[in-house]
Amino acid sequence: MLEREVRANLVYRSFTRIGGGKVPDDTVINKWALALGPEVIEDLHKRVVTIAQDKQIVEGRKMRIDTTVVETNIHYPTDSSLLGDGVRVLTRAMKRIVAIAGNVGAKLRDRSRSVKYRILEIGRAARSQGGAGKEKLQQAYRKLLEATSRVVGQAKRFSLEIASGVKKSSDVFQQAAMEGLRKELDTMAPRVQQVMQQTRARVLGGDTHVDGKLASIFEPGTEIIRKGKASKPTEFGKMVKIQEAENQMIISYEVYEKRPSDSALLVPAIETHQEQLGRVPKLVAADAGFYSASNEKTAQEKGVKRVCIPSRNTKSADRKKEQKKPWFRKGQKWRTGCEGRISVVKRRHGLNRCRDKGDRGMRRWVGLGVIADNLINIGRVLARKDKATAPIVA
């Protein structure tokens, strides 16, 4: 898409310094993006914010903050589908090993078809109601777990035989490919075993709270996050903080390895604001999830004059009166714009779902989306200023 846009647009050609030259292929552009680490993207973002401050687009008098979930690129996780994924990946790797090394050592038995039938059987049993349906479901899961266990055991034997030299190739490049496949088996087999463990606990033991629960064998860092949304009660991805100043400029973003409490993010956000813009904001606005008495006190001690964060459970008449004052309501009205900004970056810049892989890919994806949105907002503000200062022609 980027290649097509740049190729047909003279403004984009000038901006990217391509001019009349050949536009790089989309695969080359993707490789360039992947070569940039998330640390480089963060430095670029800080530079963009500094430019916005130099051009007086952002002053740092106000700050608003919110969190959202950026989903990883996975299908909806069910125990049976995750087990099916594991069998498919392990079997595919073992088939490639056999194609390289031949039929030496442990023989490959392809259980993909039987696993597929078990998954279909689970789907039919899950639609049945009553005790008989539950018993059928458990029986189908037992068969699926047994087949998956045999595939995992086979994958471990293949890995050991490659390491010991039983399965090998005289070709250097083929041997290197086989070593890569062994690493894939060593990575995926423990993940599949973890899925087997959580499946046994949930389906056979009734325990839905298993430590280290996997939502994907391809994106093991995916968190299961429930934010209470009616439209999407459960999301699978990473929690991301979006922090803004004036003119919808995102001055800070952060992807969290583990979901933190919103209230734990407020004070560090004020410190980040001060570090980035060189001043403490006069007004801080956030939703009720960021409120705590200690947060409000610390913010005021740091120099924030107006903390516009409502208290959910207050019974104090003075506090209720404070939250009805015009300045507080105005601050909360401005705060709702953060939700709109998050909606825009999700729709316009792809932050609804990360297409990159891994935690570093998530940080890179979010950072590039934030930079793109900031550049658009900088351009709009500068265009508005130029229009305001342009001489009126009679």
Predicted regions and their residues:
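DNA-recognition alpha helix
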Residues: 2-15
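Anion-binding and metal-coordination hotspots
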Residues: 6, 21-23, 29-394
